[in-house]
Amino acid sequence: MTRVKRGNVARKRRNKILKLAKGFRGSHSTLFRTANQQVMKALRSAYRDRKKKKRDFRRLWITRINAAARQHGLSYSQLIGNLKKADIQLNRKMLAQLAVLDPASFGKVAELAIQAKG
């Protein structure tokens, strides 16, 4: 069996990790072992936080909608429930943007929800 020399492969693998670790502080960007650990940790955190970002934004939208709804005498759950009854299909992101950027339009939506209540 012939001998396999893997110097190039090993160097490329290590350089790939060190390239990903660029910008880390201290030995985390220069020494392969510590850089490898930090890159793995960073990739895990990035994956986890991409999922978490969706939850965080939904919480933010709900908080904004709730604050705007209470100015019109409704709670968040009443507003959402009444919008479903009135068959108004605005998602939470759009409602939150209306509440922040165009409060008058949000007021009209809230009025429609109040009418659907009774």
UniProtKB/Swiss-Prot annotation:
Function, in words: Binds directly to 23S ribosomal RNA and is necessary for the in vitro assembly process of the 50S ribosomal subunit. It is not involved in the protein synthesizing functions of that subunit.
PROSITE patterns xref list: RIBOSOMAL_L20
Gene3D superfamilies documented for this protein: 6.10.160.10, Ribosomal protein L20
CDD domains: Ribosomal_L20
Gene name of the encoded protein: rplT
Sequence similarity: Belongs to the bacterial ribosomal protein bL20 family.
A Gene Ontology BP annotation from the UniProt entry: ribosomal large subunit assembly
Coiled coil: none
Keywords per UniProt: Ribonucleoprotein, Ribosomal protein, RNA-binding, rRNA-binding
Protein's recorded name: Large ribosomal subunit protein bL20
HAMAP family linked: Ribosomal_bL20
Organism name: Trichormus variabilis (strain ATCC 29413 / PCC 7937) (Anabaena variabilis)
UniProt keyword rRNA-binding present: yes
UniProt GO MF annotations: rRNA binding; structural constituent of ribosome
InterPro entries: Ribosomal_bL20, RIBOSOMAL_L20_CS, Ribosomal_protein_bL20_C
Pfam family for this entry, one: Ribosomal_L20
GO CC terms, sorted: ribonucleoprotein complex; ribosome
